[in-house]
A protein has these predicted regions:
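Conserved C-terminal "lid"/linker of ANL adenylate-forming enzymes
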Residues: 347, 388-390, 404-447
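Conserved pre-ATP/AMP-binding loop-to-beta segment of ANL
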Residues: 2-16, 117-140, 172-179
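AMP-binding/adenylate-forming
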Residues: 90-101, 152-168, 174-238, 251, ...
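Conserved AMP-binding A3 loop
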Residues: 27-29, 128, 136-163
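Conserved AMP-binding/adenylate-forming
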Residues: 41-80, 176-177, 181-185, 353
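Conserved AMP-binding/adenylate-forming core of the ANL superfamily
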Residues: 14-44, 153-156
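AMP-binding/adenylate-forming catalytic core of the ANL superfamily
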Residues: 326-413
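Gly/Ser/Thr-rich phosphate-binding loop
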Residues: 241-294
Length: 447
């Protein structure tokens, strides 16, 4: 391990018998987890970079820790497209792919299978600790040129962020809580809120990632309390859509897209727990938290600060340097702000200005609309003279939706045309990529 002051422990669990995870309905202790980490670390190839493709969240956590033990950097990619993986491999020729399933990277990238059974020796083992400056992860964003852009995360920055989030969310009062996530751990929000938060705060991550509402409810019911649900607005909306009973939880965390206040209120009432929304980005990680039923104002995690200049809003904190945020922010002070929307989402039509996020909020707030999104068509000269929208609204027609929108937004921003779809092409975190929307628009334009 590299030198440096005060190495940072992998785990926040204080006893070998503390529960680190739940897998296949059974608790996994810290001692067992550390034995798995040591056993896997011995089997990893001598490489510098790894894409951890493990679907099982427990195995992913073991793989992450084993890579840290071997001083290997874990790469988090914006998608699992084979072409992207090959492009990344050109930049990192010592890359390999760790998998626990049938998914393979393709091309010339070496794949390493997570063993079905690791030899476990439950002897007392010291908890690994790593230098704060150790390179832990490279988180890739799509990049303005279409070429993935890496953002380096040190172990110190990742651990500090998880501890700051835990302090703001009050997880100390939920000692040993089980974390169930509907989001993949290969993306920043999932990594921070379902893996690192558990490891650093002495919580228990859940190996599975249920998708369908009935499966999510069953998985929650199977967990002991306290229990925390980590999800997204689109998953939350699906969970609450049928109006049926959902299990009581002790906290709900939500991120990746704007959360409608009405949905937040419904979630708190149905789950019987506070819902906290997390704001962040791949470049900076998690930055701020708010409880939407109480306030629209975001408050930065301890150690994070904001400033503004002619370029926009900058954030510093958690040892990650200074990052320019890609959002329109109304700064109250260096710790508190209101979020106005994405910089790239701003539209100006007939001298009137708004954001696509604002319009999406009003669209999805219409009774009977299950999902929806506004898009700004690419027009000659770069000017936007009209907007389009895609909507999932069985039981409604265009007249009903446009009539409801007229009561909520300026007529200049009404969608022309309005397309009805059975589902929007959201990814595993509930996001809609620009490319996915472009393909959807092209499909309808060709009809």
């Amino acid at each position: 391990m590299r030198g440096g002051a005060a190495p940072i422990s992998l785990l926040g669990h204080d006893r070998p018998e503390s529960v680190v995870a739940f897998r296949n309905g059974e608790p996994v202790t810290a001692a067992h987890f550390l034995a798995d980490v040591a056993a896997l670390a011995e089997r990893l190839p001598r490489r510098g970079h790894v894409v951890n493709g493990c679907i099982d969240r427990y195995r992913f956590a073991v793989g992450l820790a084993a890579a840290l033990t071997r001083e290997q950097v874990s790469l988090l990619l914006p998608s699992d497209a084979p072409g992207l993986m090959e492009q990344i491999a050109e930049q990192y020729p010592d890359l390999y792919y760790l998998t626990d399933g049938t998914a393979m990277p393709g091309g010339a990238i070496d794949a390493v299978a997570y063993p079905e059974a690791l030899p476990v020796t439950l002897a007392a083992a010291a908890v690994p600790a790593f230098a704060a400056e150790q390179r832990a992860a490279l988180v890739f964003t799509s990049g303005s040129t279409g070429r993935p852009m890496p953002n380096l995360k040190s172990w110190g920055a990742m651990a500090a962020s998880a501890r700051a989030a835990g302090a703001r969310l009050g997880v100390a009062a939920l000692s040993g809580a089980a974390l169930l996530g509907t989001v993949p751990q290969q993306h920043m929000y999932g990594l921070e809120s379902t893996v690192l938060l558990a490891l650093q705060q002495g919580l228990a991550l859940c190996a599975g990632r249920p998708f369908y509402p009935a499966d999510v409810c069953a998985a929650l019911e199977a967990l002991p309390r306290p229990r925390i649900l980590v999800t997204t607005p689109i998953h939350l909306r699906a969970l609450l859509a049928d109006g049926g009973r959902v299990p009581v939880v002790d906290a709900v965390l939500c991120a990746t897209a704007p959360l409608a206040p009405a949905l937040a209120r419904d979630a708190e009432a149905r789950f019987g727990a506070p819902l906290h929304e997390i704001y962040g980005c791949s470049e900076a990680g998690q930055v701020a938290v708010r409880r939407p039923v109480e306030t629209e104002i975001w408050r930065c995690l301890d150690g994070f600060r904001l400033r503004q200049d002619g370029e926009g809003t900058w954030v510093t904190g958690a040892g990650a340097g200074e990052v320019l945020l890609q959002d329109v922010i109304e700064l109250i002070d260096d710790e508190r702000f209101r979020l106005q929307g994405r910089t790239a989402d701003l539209v100006n039509i007939a001298g009137k200005r708004t954001s696509l996020a604002h319009l999406n909020h009003h669209l999805t707030a219409i009774a009977g609309v299950a999902d929806g999104v506004f898009v700004a068509p690419e027009e000659a000269g770069g000017d936007v003279t009209r907007l389009a929208a895609f909507v999932v609204a069985p039981g409604l027609d265009a007249a009903a939706i446009l009539g409801a929108l007229r009561q909520r937004i300026d007529a200049a921003f009404l969608p022309r045309p309005l397309y009805f779809v059975t589902a929007l092409p959201r990814n595993a975190t509930g996001k809609l990529s620009r490319e996915a929307l472009r393909r959807l628009a092209a499909e309808f334009a060709a009809r």
